[in-house]
């Protein structure tokens, strides 16, 4: 029941009472009092309208805030998803970079090992080259010394030959021998005949080497004892007289033919 009906029923006289043909009642004699119910109703209506508007605005604001919150959450979720994707990409790049660095480090170690090996080989080859250079230089010095000795010896022989040609012709005739080349510049072949009483045409020969300072007999036919040949060579190299060699070798051949 509304307040208007309640108040009407409370303060207004009933129909039965108003219908009674009585004289003025005590209530009719009371002064009229204005309680301001209309103004109160207007104020209540305005308050209700304001309250409803406030509630509606609050509801709209709550909806807007909820929608904004949902949008913010969606944006945050999207940002989180993008950040997660960025992190995955960065992690993949980091793994790739680490693998590349490890590969480069391994390649660097291999290159350093190869460089060390090549350096060691270079040092060995340099040492070997220096040793070969020294060996070549020593060999060249030895060759030069031998060539100088040979030239000196050849000059000596040439000088001696100029004086010994008549004597050599004498011994060639008397020792029944001839001189031939032995296929080398520093060798001579001496061939004897009339050393075998049973066959005067039988020949014996030896090759004389003059490549060094001392004379040396390299080959002979028939073969002679090396010790006896060395004794003859010792006398020749001591006296430097070729006739000693020619006579000594003939004696050895005659002795060999008789045995």
UniProtKB/Swiss-Prot annotation:
Q: Which UniProt keywords apply?
A: Cell cycle, Cell division, Centromere, Chromosome, Coiled coil, Kinetochore, Mitosis, Nucleus
Q: Where in the cell is it found?
A: Nucleus; Chromosome, Centromere, Kinetochore
- Chief localization: nucleus
Q: Which InterPro entries match?
A: Spc25 (IPR045143), Spc25_C (IPR013255)
Q: Where is this region: Disordered?
A: 1-25
Provide one Gene Ontology cellular component: Ndc80 complex
The encoding gene: kpr-4
Quaternary data: Component of the NDC80 complex, which consists of kpr-1/ndc80, kpr-2/nuf2, kpr-3/spc24 and kpr-4/spc25.
Indicate whether Protein biosynthesis appears among the record's keywords. no
Which terms under GO biological process does the entry name? cell division; chromosome segregation
| Pfam families linked to this entry | Spindle_Spc25
This one is known as Probable kinetochore protein spc25
Q: Mark out the compositionally biased spans (Polar residues).
A: 1-20
Native organism is Neurospora crassa (strain ATCC 24698 / 74-OR23-1A / CBS 708.71 / DSM 1257 / FGSC 987)
Q: What does this protein do?
A: Acts as a component of the essential kinetochore-associated NDC80 complex, which is required for chromosome segregation and spindle checkpoint activity.
Protein family per UniProt: Belongs to the SPC25 family.
Q: Which residues form a coiled coil?
A: 59-162
